[in-house]
Amino acid sequence: MRRPSPSLLSIGALIALGLLGAVDAAAQPARPERADLPPNTIALTDLRAFRPTSANWRVAGDATADRVRPLALVAEPGTGVLVNVPTDAAKGHLLTTWEHGDLDLSLDVMLPKTSNSGVYLMGRYEVQLFDSWGVKTPTFADMGGIYQRWDESRGAGQQGYEGTPPAVNASRAPGLWQHLEISFRAPRFEGKKKVANARFLRVVLNGVTVQENVEVTGPTRAALFTDERATGPLMIQGDHGPVAVRNIEYKSYTGAAKLSDLTYKAWSGEGIDTTWMTTRPPMREGSVAMLSSAPAAATNRFAMAYAGTLTVPTAGRYRFSLNIDWVGTEAAMQGPTVARADLIIDGKPVIVNRGAQQGTQADVDLTGGKHAFALTFFKNRQWGDQRDVTLFIEGPGLEKQPLHDESLLAAFGNPINPIMVQASTEPVVLRSFEWHRGQKRVYVASVADPLGVHYSYDLSRGAPFYVWRGPFLETTQMWDGRGEDQSSRPAGSVVDLADAPAVAYLSDANAAWPDSVIDEKEFRRNGYVLDKAGRPTFLSTVHGVAVEDALRPDADGITLHRTVHLRAPASASVDGLYVQLAQGKHVAKQADGSYAVDDKSYLVTLPSGAAQPVVRQQSGREELLLPVRFDRGESTVAYSIVW
């Protein structure tokens, strides 16, 4: 039975009585918008989530892969990680017990040198897993590629077709964990007739979008199934090469929400607020298909009331995300006299935003089927062209979808093309602000190299804090208009390094490493000098010791070598001086002598015969430190960052 839509009188009464208290944005400080509903997780304590397979698959506690030795992957005792080591006798694929259509998937993957595997959506459409470290021009067969299709009947040399290479090579070194996200939409059928091809909306590798809106006309090569259907199992290839997988999370989508019988009433004028909705006749009214502020026909000082029916596909908990973009951080741009928005479902309050913040979220349990829907909002500002209202819904089997008209948002907005900076034939040094771990760094030099290896260096700490390959910097927030945020951001796949000074004096071996430099008597930044190629060497003074810090890419453009040269005058105290090579939750020495940092997110390697660093625990983290040993007043510390 259809539920009646709430009348405007009932909405006004709820507002007047102050009963809209489900989520009240005025009762709490402004905060960032909360995350989407959590995904499903595949428990890797055993293989029960998968169909029976061969002995090449097992559950392990971790995996170690060799950067140098091809196909060398070792499983470590425990649970939480899938490890595949195929043999001639055992090389089966791994298929989930459940099937999917539309799917958002994320997982971590580790590959040894030269290894090859794949993730097959519905057992048919492959995203390639491959050791592509250092590849300059990736193809469909490289990490993150959508693999080609194959047809023997096309003739010799023409069998392979389609296939889409990743937009950029965002892969990491063998033996490091890599993060992969896939947003996939299944083919559509009307009866037995296919009416739409399968599509990869996005493939994101290590934080970089490498595929976007790629259509696949049929199963890719080596698929388990050659036909196409509405659903199929998720498959990880087992017969090509060793691979380890962990942290498998997914959202499977089976339905959609719908607004229907949607009507609106609109008001505009000086001093507008919610009382206008119950005390004055509307200036405009009508029917629409989706939510928008456009029918108000005003940029400032307007109010709207929507009423209609919301249909959801199944019973469960649904999350609503409501945003009114005219609420700002300044006092004149926020508060109950400037803005308010109320979401009401079945006559009950779900969200109230009294102008304290732009975005508010709330969860509500709904039965499957139809529900009375109401949304009211007003803007009472005399300047500023912001008037966008957005409302998203997400729930069981329901992809996060807009209930507003997104096409009108584009018309309201002013799209900005990203402002990019690249290094072409010579290095680039760009000074800017840059965000790091929630803090805006203001003494940053970002350095791009034509070889494709880049880093950001904090001159106030004398240390690099980001390294990456691929595109260099996106500077829109610096150079568009007034440059409101005044910050740049790395455009490639970023590795986060230590958040601390690189060179420090410790009073004893257990003293805490400083997290910043605040005493200019202990640290003085002295700028940088450029070599003949245009690459900088950063200069500083630490406890009277002159420090020269040079970071240089290797000839292949895949690693970054760092050389820290220290010169101590006779008057300087040099006992207790250390260089921090790395810092993270965990630092572990590997069989090849390198050190894996932060759960194998990057490696630190030292030259053969170099002094050995020490790993110590400090405040819940681990540090890789090298005591400085001077010879005739000079010392050099050299190591490489591998990712």
Question: Which stretches of residues belong to each language-model region?
Answer:
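Short beta-strand-plus-loop segments that form exposed binding edges in beta-rich domains
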Residues: 239-240, 375-383
